[in-house]
Amino acid sequence: MSQETKMLPSLSSLLSGTEISSSPVSPSFTNPRTSFHLDDRGTIKLPPLNTSINRPRSVESALRHTVTSLHENSSAYGDDMLKHTQSDSALSSQLNSSQETVDESHENLLLTPLNSKKRDYSVSSKKNDILTPLSAAKSIIIPSASKEKRRAFAFITHSQETFPKKEPKIDNAPLARRKRRRTSSQELSILQAEFEKCPAPSKEKRIELAESCHMTEKAVQIWFQNKRQAVKRQRIATSKSTTIIQTVSPPSPPLDVHATPLASRVKADILRDGSSCSRSSSSSPLENTPPRPHHSLNRRSSTPSIKRSQALTFHLNPQKKTLTPVKTSPNSRVNKLINSIDHSPSKAKRPVSNPSGSPKRKRKFGFKIVDQQPLKDLDPNAFRG
């Protein structure tokens, strides 16, 4: 086989454009041969950027565009190819084949216009679905017509503008409050007079009051409810205050036994009995015991109030109708012995003559009272007799 040497064209031939290129040209590659102009100095000047220089495009990229863009691109593409490849026959034949392929693709696209529309719609929908911070804020603040029924937040409050019409979409507006209606003095007097008659009027009566007071029936009902609650609270407060005053009462003064009229009478009787006893003791020669002073009786009567173990009791004299204080002992037997003594004047104590001269008193039970002397040594033989 004879080896053929392939030579590249010279630079001058490429610049002049007279040499026919022997290299195969792909149908999708455009090779616009622009003639470069040389200056007087021999420098090459590039063409201005305003001239339309199309980039090489493949058949697949051409199929992705719309029909109109493909038509415009194909016409411009064909014109440029015809301008620069008039002398090249091989290139012109390949250009025809490329135009045929473009026409076939053009016909295929014309036959299936729905697919392109679907693609365009999907692309546009994808673009619209992309959310930016600004678009998200706009969608929340200004909801679209299709999302009017949706609520922006779970908690919805009324605003001043949307309260009479519909629910608001957001709650950043100031809260709407109904204006409070103040009753006049004339209306208040009518309602209070009716409340004094009947605290809970019927519905017919409430309607009459609403017409006379220029109010609604519901407003009259609410006024009566509030009035009943206020009266109930006031009644409870007054009852509590009265109970507190009753519980916190001033303490009663202590009972003075000596200040009572009965005690003063008893005291006078005791003094009188004491004086009579002193006279009888001074007249009798056998009893040498001096009478007890009056202050001892007072001290004796006052001591039971101090000591808890002793109690002050009185003995009633049926003839003179006087009370005599009797000192009680915690021993019940001693109390019986003391209270059993008869203090009546008919049975007065008679002094018994004692030959030895020592004053001895004989009691009911035969107890012997020995003279009160300081303790001495006890003689056990003295008790045998």
UniProtKB/Swiss-Prot annotation:
Locate the compositionally biased regions of type Low complexity: 10-23, 87-99, 275-284
Entry keyword set: Cell cycle, DNA-binding, Homeobox, Nucleus, Repressor, Transcription, Transcription regulation
Q: Which GO terms describe its cellular component?
A: chromatin; cytoplasm; nucleus
Chief location of this protein within or outside the cell? nucleus
Query: Per its record, what triggers expression of this gene product?
Result: Transcriptionally activated by SWI4-SWI6 heterodimer.
State if Transcription regulation is listed as a keyword.
Answer: yes
Where are the residues of the annotated region Disordered?
Answer: 1-57, 87-113, 235-259, 271-385
Q: Which GO terms describe its biological process?
A: cell differentiation; G1/S transition of mitotic cell cycle; negative regulation of transcription by RNA polymerase II; regulation of transcription by RNA polymerase II
Q: Per UniProt, what is one Pfam family of this protein?
A: Homeodomain
DNA-binding region as annotated in the record: 176-235
In which compartments does the protein localize? Nucleus
Check the record and name the InterPro entries matching this protein: HD, Homeobox_CS, Homeobox_DNA-bind_prot, Homeodomain-like_sf
Polar residues compositional bias, start-end: 24-34, 236-249, 299-312, 319-343
Q: What does this protein do?
A: Transcriptional repressor required to restrict transcription of ECB-dependent genes to the G1/M phase by repressing their transcription during the interval from late G1 to M phases. Genes that contain a ECB (early cell box) element in their transcription regulatory region are transcribed only during G1/M phases. In vitro, is capable of binding to the DNA of the leucine tRNA gene.
Subunit structure, interactors included: Interacts with MCM1.
**Which protein are we looking at?**
Homeobox protein YOX1
Q: What is the lineage of its organism?
A: Eukaryota, Fungi, Dikarya, Ascomycota, Saccharomycotina
